[in-house]
């Protein structure tokens, strides 16, 4: 787990140009673009539920940015996230300390939260099939 990177999957042909002229990774509230659900109200509901409404009135820049933890260091990234793009950015290791991690898609009402330093309760929820499918 010590080397598990946080990555951001993306479609190079449609999203890479957003990264070229910017100094920050922007969320859909800032760009109005998404490879997932684009509904602001749906995403606001998920984030309100996950974070007890702490981001409800936040500016777009202050809102959640989404990525995934490549806990098995698969060179193809996280296979369950391939729908967001086959390519990905590898974030610097110190970013992990500022991340909230879920055991499943964050839109799920039953998603459990953790952090990189407090993650074992999430790993214990993985089935053998989920772990094996990562290899």
Task: Label each PLM-derived region with a short phrase.
Residues 2-12, 27-58, 75, 85-135:
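Active-site-proximal loop/hinge segments that shape catalytic or ion-binding/gating pockets
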Residues 7, 17-19:
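Long, low-complexity, Ser/Thr/Gly/Pro-rich intrinsically disordered segments that act as flexible linkers
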Residues 56-82:
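Extended catalytic/binding region for NAD+/ADP-ribose chemistry, centered on the ART fold
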């Amino acid at each position: 787990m010590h080397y598990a990177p946080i990555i951001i999957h993306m479609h190079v042909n449609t999203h890479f140009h957003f990264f070229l002229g910017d100094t920050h990774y922007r969320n859909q509230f800032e760009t109005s673009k998404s490879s997932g659900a684009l509904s602001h109200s749906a995403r606001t509901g998920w984030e309100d539920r996950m974070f007890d409404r702490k981001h409800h009135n936040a500016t777009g820049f202050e809102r959640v940015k989404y990525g995934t933890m490549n806990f098995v260091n698969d060179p193809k990234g996280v296979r369950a996230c391939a729908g967001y793009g086959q390519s990905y950015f590898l974030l610097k290791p110190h970013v992990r300390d500022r991340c909230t991690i879920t055991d499943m898609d964050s839109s799920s009402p039953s998603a459990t939260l953790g952090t990189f330093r407090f993650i074992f309760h999430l790993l214990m929820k993985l089935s053998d099939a989920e772990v094996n499918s990562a290899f």
